[in-house]
Amino acid sequence: MSGHSKWHNIQKTKGAADAKRSAAFTKIAKEIIVAVKQGGSGDPANNSRLATVIAKAKANNMPNDNIKRTIDKALGSGNTDNYESVTYEGYGPGGVAVIVEALTDNRQRTAPEVRHYFDKFGKGMGAQGCVSWSFDRKGVIIIDNEDGDYDEDTVMMDALEAGAADFAADGPVFEITTDPDAFNDVIAALEAKGYTFVSADISLVPQTYVKLTSEEDIKNMEKLLDMLDDNEDVQNTYHNWETED
């Protein structure tokens, strides 16, 4: 099976998360709290949203103790953390489509900050729906086979038998995509067979990609993504910039 791998689009984000692990854990903890409160349960078997966030936490090497403490905190009667999910859409340099998902306790703080990033480094923030139509929501699981521990055909068969929608190999990197509703089942089936992931989340995958040729556009796009990544309210940033291999 084939398809354009999004690995090149997340490599930079993954590296930034490794360099800023504490900040990454803080953002994931916020997602866990929201998942527990909205799902009404601290048991991932009874809370599919929590199960999805836990898969993301494990892929980011968040210790199990941290995950458990965060769940316990969310279940505690004294917890007053209240976050609202908000989504912003806009355009980066060269017309790159960008979607920003945030969890915030103050829209009046977050919206102007995100708008400033778009105005300074991109083409501005747009109305809801201006770019989201060009993305599909999918489960995306990334396996790194740089050490050659996995056989490509075996991984593909295991993934498809677990219910994955597609499989793509990009050098030593395997990308598995799923329907959102099948994501948790596929994760559980692959984990049961001993697979580990460098990334696992329900993501927005672009239908088409944009290449930037101007050095200025490339630098501004990198700055835009860095600013969004550094914002404590921003949880996820999706875009259709096709970086060079």
Region annotations inferred by a language model:
Residues M1-G126, V131-I142, H239-E242:
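N-terminal cationic and glycine-rich segments that engage phosphates or anionic surfaces
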